[in-house]
């Protein structure tokens, strides 16, 4: 009886006063601009918050880059002047194209640029994006991220568990350790942290890049990255004080 009474009270509390509802609907009918203005105000507030979050990340890249880098794989200059952060998805065809361009770019600027890889698997459209990211992270724990990354992009049309194990064998990884780590909670935590950083930047697709404080996206051409590098090289980068980091060469 008590339960029935409580349910009745809840339902009663949830009921909308018909008179009040009619008045509200009449106001909306007579003044539709009120709804439009409210929506616009909400959108502006959302955009403001997103912009603030983005600027916070960009400022952090400038003042405390090692915090942004964290334990992400890096290649290139160990004492860099230019920081290039890549957000990528192993199942994204545009990322595979950008990967080839980045290899050419880094071959030219190994002593000047530090490339940082961040995972941003688009799981809503790419079913193998997350498993591939976990496999790459597990390979990183054995010092083979960049080689593993190359293999994933080179065989993007074959993504799946069979390929992940085959690449691990080819790179002479400890398979037991590899399989344990790619299925463990640590991989999820690291990738989720990268995703959160991407969301703060307002990233909606891949590939996405940040060079120092400048952002750009898509399957960029080599000439585009060179132009952005030239622009950033002219800036005063005295605040970009990175501690030396282990280097993994791009093959």
Which residues make up each language-model segment?
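Structural alpha/beta surface segment adjacent to cysteine/selenocysteine redox centers
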Residues: 85, 90-91, 96-169, 173-174, ...
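Soluble non-cytosolic domains of exported or imported proteins
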Residues: 14-18, 22, 29, 93-96, ...
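Soluble periplasmic/extracytoplasmic beta-strand elements of cell-envelope proteins
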Residues: 25, 38, 83-86, 114-118, ...
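N-terminal targeting signals for export/organelle localization
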Residues: 1-63, 245-251
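Short amphipathic alpha-helical/adjacent loop interface patches that line ligand
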Residues: 32, 99, 195
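A short beta-strand-turn-helix
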Residues: 65-82, 107
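C-terminal cap of thioredoxin/glutaredoxin-like
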Residues: 5, 12-21, 25, 169-251
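Short amphipathic alpha-helical surface patches that mediate protein-protein
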Residues: 29, 40-43, 153-157, 169, ...
């Amino acid at each position: 009886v008590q339960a029935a009474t409580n349910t009745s009270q809840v339902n009663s509390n949830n009921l909308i006063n018909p008179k009040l509802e009619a008045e509200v609907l009449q106001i909306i009918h007579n003044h539709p601009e009120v709804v439009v203005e409210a929506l616009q105000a909400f959108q502006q507030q959302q955009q403001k918050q997103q912009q603030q979050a983005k600027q916070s990340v960009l400022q952090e890249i400038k003042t405390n880059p090692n915090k942004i880098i964290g334990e992400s794989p890096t290649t290139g200059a160990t004492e860099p002047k230019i920081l290039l952060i890549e957000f990528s998805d192993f199942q994204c065809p545009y990322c595979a194209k950008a990967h080839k361009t980045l290899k050419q770019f880094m071959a030219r600027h190994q002593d000047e640029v530090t490339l940082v890889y961040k995972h941003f698997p688009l799981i809503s459209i790419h079913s193998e994006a997350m498993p591939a990211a976990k496999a790459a992270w597990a390979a990183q724990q054995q010092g083979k991220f960049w080689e593993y990354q190359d293999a994933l992009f080179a065989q993007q049309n074959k993504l799946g568990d069979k390929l992940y194990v085959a690449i691990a064998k080819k790179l002479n990884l400890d398979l037991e350790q590899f399989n344990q780590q790619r299925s463990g909670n640590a991989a999820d935590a690291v990738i989720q942290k990268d995703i959160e950083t991407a969301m703060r930047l307002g990233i909606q697709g891949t590939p996405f890049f940040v060079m120092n404080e400048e952002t750009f996206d898509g399957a960029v051409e080599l000439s585009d990255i060179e132009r952005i590098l030239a622009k950033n090289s002219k800036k005063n980068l005295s605040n970009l004080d990175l501690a030396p980091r282990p280097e993994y060469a791009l093959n």
